[in-house]
């Protein structure tokens, strides 16, 4: 008879944004460290954890459906994540859920797991976790979360009510994690938070320490330190504070990627005021021009909302005019959707759905034309590409201008002598509005 003890198995579902993905990775790393197996199927698991998203109504619905599926297939379910902040809403639909915790409640999640599926016995000297921890991304890139929460109160958003005010991670801790990731083979770090440019504001940019050296807790100092690791560093979710200007020279010098993800949301000063967002559109255009003068290779990504309450045709036209002048490289656009608990719900003059749809189509048509023109400028040039996938037909990678999942790709047909994580030089042969095609130099 075998005396091998069966390891308890945990199923895991991770929904939502990269910030939620990082939370999932942390929970999974702790579970693996304690000796739990993480399995891909519900019926094979002793319990299922669902890390939910609650940002917009469609995300709430997806989360509730995932919880329901886990209950049907397994029966023992713990819920965490952003929707977990709305306990009553979950209990009303799924009363059989065992436990519910809010976002970044790692310790609570683990305590609940220990209660229902006791910790297994395992050899503490046998490492069950890779050096970089359990990652849900490919091995060659990783998200680095530098803070939690947000101090802004944008009227379309409920993140602060779910994740709280800004809490910056100690800079020494952040840099140590980055170093571990690089040592484990990561070639690209994507810096994320709810508000990356506010990093350190809550601690008055106090001085921390890394490897015995003093380092200021700020976005600029963080970028300076990350640049020493010799990998690609990409900034996401950058609020347009004045000090963002200070990172552009670092991009021009090649210290971090010339890529800025800066959600602007709209271009009408009146709508921006209703959103409780910065409203100096002329100033933003001047800054964009200045940034490009300092760093000609700069890629600008942004997101916008159309059909926000009170948006008139004149407001929308201001947005289109802004797009024409700014000529942003990568743009996402969302039709405004009411979110339970958001301040914008109480605003007058809600925009009809058919008007939102019509404006969204006009927005996308214009931006696709701009994006296609911007990418066409790259044809004939040589660029660096990091490889993401390789199969018998060729390789797929990304340029410095492309973040994983949300931007375009570079297709290298017939190029099979590479592996994920390789950075190679490519000549661009063709382009459309989103992607590039090229050949290895």
Curated annotation (Swiss-Prot):
Main location class: cytoplasm
InterPro entries, per database record: Elp3/MiaA/NifB-like_rSAM (IPR006638), Methylthiotransferase (IPR005839), Methylthiotransferase_CS (IPR020612), Methylthiotransferase_N (IPR013848), Methylthiotransferase_N_sf (IPR038135), NA-bd_OB-fold (IPR012340), Ribosomal_uS12_MeSTrfase_RimO (IPR005840), rSAM (IPR007197)
GO molecular function: 4 iron, 4 sulfur cluster binding; aspartic acid methylthiotransferase activity; metal ion binding; protein methylthiotransferase activity
EC number(s) given by UniProt: 2.8.4.4
Domain (Radical SAM core): residue spans on this chain: 136-373
Keywords tagged on the record: 4Fe-4S, Cytoplasm, Iron, Iron-sulfur, Metal-binding, S-adenosyl-L-methionine, Transferase
Pfam families linked to this entry: Radical_SAM, TRAM_2, UPF0004
Family membership: Belongs to the methylthiotransferase family. RimO subfamily.
Function: Catalyzes the methylthiolation of an aspartic acid residue of ribosomal protein uS12.
Protein name: Ribosomal protein uS12 methylthiotransferase RimO
Organism: Citrobacter koseri (strain ATCC BAA-895 / CDC 4225-83 / SGSC4696)
